[in-house]
Curated annotation (Swiss-Prot):
Bilayer disposition of the protein: Peripheral membrane protein
Disulfide bonds: none
Localisation: Plastid, Chloroplast thylakoid membrane
GO biological-process terms attached to the record: photosynthesis
NCBIfam families: PRK02603.1
Keyword NADP set for record: no
Listed name of the protein: Photosystem I assembly protein Ycf3
Gene behind the chain: ycf3
Keyword Translocase: no
Source organism (scientific name): Ranunculus macranthus
Length: 168
């Protein structure tokens, strides 16, 4: 049974109803409809913290979805789950894959920067300043890209870039 039929959350039910209406109105192929259903069910499972179920739905959605823009959001959400699970290498891979299909995802650049910054902080705690600097430099590059795409957002990152003298 599709997740949209079992979810008790009012907002999720409302979203599901609107999404189902749009799927009937907008001319789409059955494959596109099926991909969207898996994506929607993945988002619902993810919002409830059911990451294994969300990943299953997202993987199926990526198998069916042919539009690069839509695929980018599926891949981005897979990256979010891997980030939440502490699987940073996998998360970075999925953020990269999302950006290959849609280079205008500032949130992917931001999340990549956060992971790099975290790894830099880990290196500092381990006493490896050279590795820490490399990770911090990489974080700076990703934050610059996120800020360039959405000026005025990512204020904390912008301040960090200024404080660390990495902002040009």
């Amino acid at each position: 049974m599709p997740r949209s039929r079992i979810n008790g959350n009012f907002i999720d039910k409302t979203f599901s109803i609107v999404a189902n209406i749009l799927l009937r109105i907008i001319p789409t192929t059955s494959g596109e409809k099926e991909a969207f259903t898996y994506y929607r069910d993945g988002m619902s499972a993810q919002s409830e913290g059911n990451y294994a179920e969300a990943l299953q739905n997202y993987y199926e959605a990526t198998r069916l979805e042919i539009d690069p823009y839509d695929r980018s959001y599926i891949l981005y959400n897979i990256g979010l789950i891997h980030t939440s699970n502490g699987e940073h290498t996998k998360a970075l891979e999925y953020y990269f894959r999302a950006l290959e299909r849609n280079p205008f995802l500032p949130q992917a650049f931001n999340n990549m920067a956060v992971i790099c910054h975290y790894r830099g902080e880990q290196a500092i705690r381990q006493g490896d300043s050279e590795i820490a600097e490399a990770w911090s430099d990489q974080a700076a590059e990703y934050w610059k890209q996120a800020i360039a795409l959405t000026p005025g957002n990512y204020i904390e990152a912008h301040n960090w870039l200024k404080i660390t003298r990495r902002f040009e």
